């Protein structure tokens, strides 16, 4: 799992919001470039940037600040906020942005998302921001009645590879991510899920890793010193290394079984209840498909 430190831009400065309310915007750093350099020095490989003014206005407002960051750090940067047409997508990607995030457009103009994905593939991500499970748009100022899982499934059908999922109630609260919401989403689609909102501790990082998510975004907790970015990145690396070693040990054990027999015993359970349904046997091909 990757950790993406966040920079939210308003009037060219780094700010943080509380529960998505623009009236609560608080400047946490004057210089996006210096902030990005700090993230890079702490081991970040990716960074998440949002043009808050652009998200609200429907067109880029802080692109120059974003380009200054790109010119001064060697990071993969994903950018969202006010990206509503192919011209803007191409504008960002041509300047070196690694991934652009389509938010309101995913809700209102899926044909545009389809076109962008067809042309740029994995360089396109979709941001799904929700209140009480319903998708919000226009910088969180407008609420729809579309369920976040429903929208995610539509995006999966289009071919979207990455979804950034934000529980708006969690934004800026530093009281932990919505694990239930994220787990449900991760189980519902095959897209790579990036968690956003409420991430504030190493325990949160471990919990998100355990869900099998692709990434986690952290902002306010880093600025306030509650989450040590370097420690979070190292923790993910260590957990991943341990999981890899465990997986290798399991693979070795399974290989020993298959050397003795073409079939291995398997306990079949109901996923939702855990009820044991039967004892069966599976071959190597069946095992691979079930993992």
Descriptions of predicted regions:
Residues 12-23, 90-93, 97-171:
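Conserved anion-binding
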Residues 73-99, 180-218:
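Catalytic cores of alpha/beta
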Residues 46-64, 104, 109, 164-175:
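Glycine-rich, proline-tolerant flexible connector loops at the mouths of alpha/beta enzymes
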Residues 2-6, 46, 74-78, 98-101, ...:
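Structural preference for beta-strand elements that scaffold enzyme active sites
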Residues 238-291:
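Flexible "arm" and connector segments at domain edges
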């Amino acid at each position: 799992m990757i950790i993406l430190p966040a920079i939210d831009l308003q009037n060219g400065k780094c700010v943080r919001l509380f529960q998505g309310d623009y009236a609560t915007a608080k400047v946490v750093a004057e210089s996006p470039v210096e902030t990005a350099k700090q993230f890079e020095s702490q081991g970040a490989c990716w960074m998440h940037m949002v043009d808050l003014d652009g998200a609200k206005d429907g067109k880029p407002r802080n692109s120059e600040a974003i380009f200054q960051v790109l010119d001064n750090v060697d990071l993969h940067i994903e950018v969202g906020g006010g990206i509503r047409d192919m011209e803007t997508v191409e504008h960002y990607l041509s300047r070196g942005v690694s991934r652009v995030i389509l938010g309101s457009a995913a809700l209102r103009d899926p044909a545009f998302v389809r076109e962008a994905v067809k042309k740029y593939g994995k360089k396109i991500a979709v941001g799904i921001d929700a209140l009480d499970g319903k998708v919000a748009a226009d910088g969180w100022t407008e609420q729809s009645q579309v369920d976040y899982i429903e929208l995610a499934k539509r995006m999966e059908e289009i071919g979207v590879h990455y979804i950034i999922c934000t529980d708006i109630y969690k934004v800026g609260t530093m009281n932990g991510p919505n694990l239930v919401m994220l787990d449900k989403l991760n189980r519902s689609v095959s897209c790579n899920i990036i968690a956003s909102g409420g991430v504030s501790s190493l325990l949160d990082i471990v919990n998100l890793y355990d869900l099998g998510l692709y990434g986690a975004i952290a902002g306010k907790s880093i600025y306030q010193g509650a989450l040590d970015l370097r420690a979070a990145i190292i923790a993910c690396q260590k957990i991943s290394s341990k999981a890899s070693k465990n997986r290798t040990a399991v693979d070795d054990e399974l290989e020993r079984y298959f050397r003795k027999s073409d079939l291995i015993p398997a306990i079949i359970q109901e996923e939702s209840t855990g009820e044991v349904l039967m004892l069966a046997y599976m071959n190597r091909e069946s095992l691979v498909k079930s993992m």
